[in-house]
Amino acid sequence: MDVATWAKSYARAWVEMDPEAAADLFTDDASYRSFIFDEPHIGRDGVRSYWSEVTSTQAEVQVTMGRPIVDGPRAAVEFWTTMENSGEEVTLVGCLLLTFDDDGQCRSLSEYYEFAEGRLDPPAAWGAL
């Protein structure tokens, strides 16, 4: 699987709030760091557990992924997400730093993001190279 296909699958799993589909994108021993200073979620079980927790408060999720920037097994992908989180409309914008194995499974993910209140649209040319 190439990085663009992986990113689309990640976005679909988020929109569908599907922890199993998300976990399937990762290696058995993957590291998923959702907060850079916290310990990572480890393996598919860790990803599944994390996604089950965070998506439980989300609704009306819309995700747009930017065009990946790829350098060998490493990639960076921006995301722009609007949703209801705990009943409040929010926009979540960020970047995923990813490392992949030879089969296109993600071995590591580090996530950097910011929240804003309300549903905001991306600026012109967002996510393009």
Question: Could you tell me what each predicted segment is?
Answer:
Residues 16-31:
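Short, well-ordered alpha-helical segments enriched in acidic and aromatic residues
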Residues 13, 25, 54-57:
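Short alpha-helical functional segments enriched in proximate histidine and acidic residues
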Residues 5-13:
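Solvent-exposed, amphipathic alpha-helical segments
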Residues 6, 18-21, 50, 94:
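Hydrophobic alpha-helical segments typical of transmembrane helices
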Residues 2, 48, 52-129:
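A beta-strand edge to alpha-helix "cap/lid" segment located at domain peripheries
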Residues 31-41, 57:
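A short gly/proline-enriched turn/hairpin at secondary-structure junctions
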